[in-house]
Amino acid sequence: MSTIEKAGRPMLLGKRRETLGSMYSLVGSHSAVKLCRWQKSMMRGRGGCYKWTMYGIESHRCMEATPSMACANKCVFCWRLNTNPTATKWRWQVDEPQIIVEGMLSSHKALVSGVRGMPGVTEKGLEEAMNPRHCALSLVGEAVLYPYVNDFLHVLHGKGISTFLVNNGQFPDALKELRPVTQLYLSVDAPNKETMKFLDRPVFPDYWDRFNQSVVNMSEKKERTVFRLTMINGFNMSEENIPEYQGIFETGRPNFIELKRLTPAFSGNTRTVLRIKNVPSWEQLKAYAKRLCEVIFDGKEYEVATLHEHSGCILLAQKRFKINGIWHTWIDFEHFNAMVLDPILSARIVADGYLRPTPSWALPESEGEGFDPAQTRHVTAKRQKYLASKPAGEE
């Protein structure tokens, strides 16, 4: 790393740093970590997030982070309230990967320590949470924008930490050069150019071309790939959108497709055009997932494999992950980490080379609709009142 790169101005200064520092635990000059509610929930035995149900990621052992607070979009549905910088290229001081990772782990431990004493938190759960085994690079910003993202990933893998990297499809060249991660995501926020401009508010004028090139680049990746959709009533989940999604999915051929309904986090964001009416019901989401399965490759390629009603997420998987009638959407993390650290084995990584069977409680027909029966679901008094006010069978 050159002296010039180290001497550049920091990404976050003054009021912006103060504002973001109140929302995240900032690491160095451009990175951050944060505890999510599911981490605390699983520490208390109250259930994990959809990534536990679908992939076997223990929520309390997952560190949510980013090596770049900057992003090329200002999405209207972003529940981070768009306080982070926008950028089309890196123009700031660059922190070293090793220092970033060490800072993240230190900050994460400090955040977890703050949960000690919370009702239901056990010492075992707390100790496990202190030593994360997974890193969700989806906190905020665009991870692939960080110039040394591959070195950063290598440091994480070297510590036995699996990597789940989300990208918005605006940096196709960086995506193409990205080395294998445990699971690679592309956000598909809209099925067409006009809707993407409205929902994502991209800063690149050629955003649609960049996105489509990223779809092609994703199709060339050998590790597990996921196309991630935030479903918004009235914007991106009409019947007319189905053939548009079909074109994207048949080009990108992702191993998995996540349909996650809009998170109704509108409090404090008076400028958003979104309202509760834009949050699809669970039944609407399931119906849309079924339609996509029927249409993509004429129904020959994908099925609903798992779901998690609690967080409003449904996973479509390529049928090749259903081995001898049993879904294998879970991940063998130890096997992946052993491969990715070996220069020879790393080149041989393939999506179906590090699988584990999906537990029966995670399947679509499960009684708990993806909620782990070993956990205890906690329903707040406010939620109980809301459910009691709804007609039977309606959310």
Question: Across the structure, where does each feature detected by a protein language model lie?
Answer:
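Flexible, acidic/Gly-rich N-terminal and inter-domain linker regions that tether
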Residues: 1-69, 73-77, 81-107, 387-395
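Radical SAM enzyme [4Fe-4S]-AdoMet core and its adjacent flexible, acidic
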Residues: 2-12, 18, 27-29, 197-209, ...
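A broad, low-specificity signal marking well-ordered, structured residues that form hydrophobic/aromatic
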Residues: 33, 63, 135, 225, ...
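Structured loops at beta-to-helix junctions and adjacent beta-edge loops in soluble globular domains
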Residues: 38, 68, 140, 230, ...
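Short Gly/Ser/Thr- and Asp/Glu-enriched loop/turn motifs at secondary-structure junctions
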Residues: 60, 130-132, 308-312
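Conserved alpha-helical substructure of the radical SAM core
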Residues: 70, 81-139, 147
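Short, acidic Gly/Pro/Ser/Thr-rich loop/turn segments
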Residues: 70-74, 193, 264, 323
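Conserved AdoMet/S-adenosylmethionine-binding subsite of the radical SAM
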Residues: 117-291
